[in-house]
């Protein structure tokens, strides 16, 4: 979402993000200067503004940026993304372009001079921001026209608005900052209607309910603004109405009831809006498991392509076919990602999403996901990394949930040479419950990858020795985890590349 920010805000977010990317807690200002190629004055100015902004925005204290008394060192504990997310969301809310989009989504014509005065920004500045947005969004067939209204591919417009709002709204009370009271009231009425009429809707989590409210608010705003989805050139994802299963037919009927309550549309537009509503509910998590049986051939081809590539990468990594039960489970879980990929390729997605694969607790899954998405890009002939970056988190989480850790994570053999019986037992328990590792604890020093001892072992060879005289501190255990994960990853890559030679 950095394209919504001003130039200085982009630099501030980049500065904070660098701590997360490098997993560093402290950095010298000269090191930051060399990395970003910025002057000392600019670095210190940005840091002072960040210190002011985090107070102004009420950013959570945990993990806040700090400047040393000597003003030569910056400290940030990157273990909690609340700071980065809160800071970015606050900058987006204040950006002129974001506020222009909120005005434009209502489809009310507004003169540039009036809008600039309302936003308290120079007219030329706002004009340049809109021009840059149009240059960026034009490949997706979206633009802000001369009357400062959003026009173009309606499905892409709604997708963009929902994505933006989900980045800045983290509680339902914040909806009032961006939507009129009557829209929120209507969205609440529709949500309750779905919950009373659909068993799955009644079981939505709090997060899913917030997602549903954002989707509904955007949908209702665009419906009331007479911006029909018939203006979209998106592929028809679903089968014809009479070919849908009973679950989706019932959702179509529910959606038609909702639409008729607020606007009057001709039958063709009513059908398209109702079908859009079904996909909206699928994105929230309703009836997602039915998608493959109701999607058209184009989605089926994308789905089959993703499944085949995942099985191919699995075969390359482990020298065996993916088990049949896992193949079946994978096919079910790929339904929503297939629809996302189809949509992103159709609009030629050009967003620059956060994509950091360093310092993962599960580097094996990171490598698998990276290889998988690289193959997807190659198959589709995509030269850029934008779509890969956008979908990385989706597939990374999917593979962590699906692929057996006994297959993905090599076993690490650790010898414990600890004399104290209680400490020996407690350390063994600590090691064996680490989800990111598969540790075999023994007393054998000959066939081991690491040794943990409570004394020095001068004669120990061919293994890394870690000495803990007491139960480890946070820092000691964190250092051990880094070492153990790296050793495991080395074994993983050696087995893969050794097999492929």
Predicted regions, residues:
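A cross-family "folded-core" feature that marks the main globular domain of proteins
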Residues: 1-501
